From Swiss-Prot:
GO molecular function: structural constituent of ribosome
Keywords: Ribonucleoprotein, Ribosomal protein
Region annotation (Disordered) ranges: 1-23
Annotated protein name in UniProt: Large ribosomal subunit protein bL35
BP-aspect Gene Ontology terms: translation
Length: 64
């Protein structure tokens, strides 16, 4: 059986912490002028993968 390979796209997007998986925030790349400062400030906060999606993400980055 061949080696399990890390999904490189997922490896760049997710970081594994002690007990959660950190992810980037959506809606932050462009068209920021119409967004309020409060919205942009909240988007800077850390975001985590939901418990339901964690097994799928772990499968993609398991060898990483």
């Amino acid at each position: 059986m061949p080696k399990m390979k890390t999904h490189r796209g997922a490896a760049k997007r997710f970081k594994k912490t002690k007990n959660k998986i950190k992810r980037g925030s959506a809606f932050r790349s462009h068209i920021l002028t119409k967004k309020s400062p409060k919205t942009k400030r909240h988007l800077r906060a850390p975001h985590y993968v939901s418990k339901v999606d964690e097994p799928r993400v772990i499968e993609l980055i398991s060898t990483y």
